[in-house]
């Protein structure tokens, strides 16, 4: 494995910082995390993306805080940002005005870099560029005395190229957003009209490549910069086999769900049971609250955050729905601290009137001791109440059993699932069809775990035995039956923060790092690695992800949100279409969903009740300056059939999580096929509705589903309904003798306004505010 550039900034950072922060408050600091850059033997030989974000500089200045007080955490992060700036700025001023300035030019260069990084953190790229330019100029002068740093001048060119490209994004994509901005490959509407940023980026990238022509990362970034100017190439990543797939359109802005925030989770669910799917998003920014967008049923959404009592729910790297009290109202669980430092999570009870109450402490789930990125709900002991596995980073993960009275007990030790790892994802699923929910845990920087549920309240770890411990650098994960054989398969995304590996993929070069993994259930209690056979031996640095059926053919497709904290991590998100359970095709370009901005919480859902699944993505980066508009990709529809099934438990948990659905479908020629689903919200970073949307294909005998079978986890009953009309919404209650037709009014999602010149009002935004 290669370390990233042997850059002077890294060489001198520790020495300079030790001078400036060896103060009486040094022991009052929060523990800091360098986990983004961790490596592990066996994960591949790859180059990590150049760091331009300021997150390291600001995190160094973080001091003590109250992990249970969300406002305290917000203030502590603000203070850290200001402290980092004042420290570097003050030291630079003193050094530049000292008699030793000429002798200590390298330190001056490093301090300019540090200030450039801090301004980048805030998103003020004009000021960041001022410091990066000043640092480059000083370094060029210093080479007369320090020729050993000549190569580092080349990497400052890359930093400046990235910074100018980001400035171009801010001027064109963020401040003057339209539905085509940052959709790869860029259309004419997506090209930059304010070209100063990209033009300067091209200059610096070319300067870098004149010295380092083999740097694939910079070649990729140069190509993107050229594309924003109307040149460049889209590469050849999409599979070329002709496939009919719909092209989606981003309608987040006209529908009112395009809130500009940092990275976070996304839940699409009908929170008030009015028949329309609503949206809740979180933000990793400790000063940004949850946002609740209520579906009005007319193509638009209303922001009910304040009314819902969610304005004080600050921060949250991820979120997921549950129904912990079995009242039929979807509750919310918010996870915090992932990639950062320990802080509290939140359990929010749905009151049934579009308001929520924080019951974290009352439920027994309040803690400030952990960093959490993932949590997953299931009834692991089949007592009819949803339990929760909370996956922590580095500290032992926890399993909480629902007592059925609104409180939880920690049964981690008894269950045997408390291993310590840097856990980034988890998913429940009954992979061996024995009626008990099993648990898969995805770890970043180590082997993954598969816990087999023994049915007595304890689990056996069988991951290594069954060969499902990889990727070693993994992130989101899920169980799904991709081949419709009635047995859950396992998908695990890799997270290798390497732009070079993405470029290699587009150039048709073999990967040098870990790829994603698809494990096919062998129906004998184990799995087979079919990644290569399924066409998925690709390196995609995945963060948010989920699965759904984009074309109603009945086979589950999936979407991968990509990125890393650095502004240099510009790569498309990816859509993969399932080819009848045999393999997957990259249909990113064809579907128009290849957003270049960073993809986090992902949900597939029918937002307009028209019988196809749309795609909601929480777009935005990890740092405050990398906020972006969320995306709602509207599905244009197709001629294939579908059914939406809402299950309601009685003896089993009310949300029916873990219940199994089997559809028998007969086409017009008499051929029989099957569809299988297990009720979940999907992947571990993004939550789709619990009501199951199931595609049926284009040809149905008499327009009906031959049979619907439901298997319930607690009562062990199996319901069967025959000759059910397709293309409708139904509800099936546990033990009921018939299903209920649900009235669901369809409507059109608001569309972007047509404009001959989408950039007519372009004006670059300026910032003069200091941190």
What is the role of each PLM region?
Residues 169-193, 335-340, 493-511, 561-569, ...:
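Short, conserved, GDST-rich strand-edge loop motifs in beta-rich repeat architectures
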Residues 66, 71, 138-154, 162-207, ...:
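Short coil/linker segments at helix-helix boundaries
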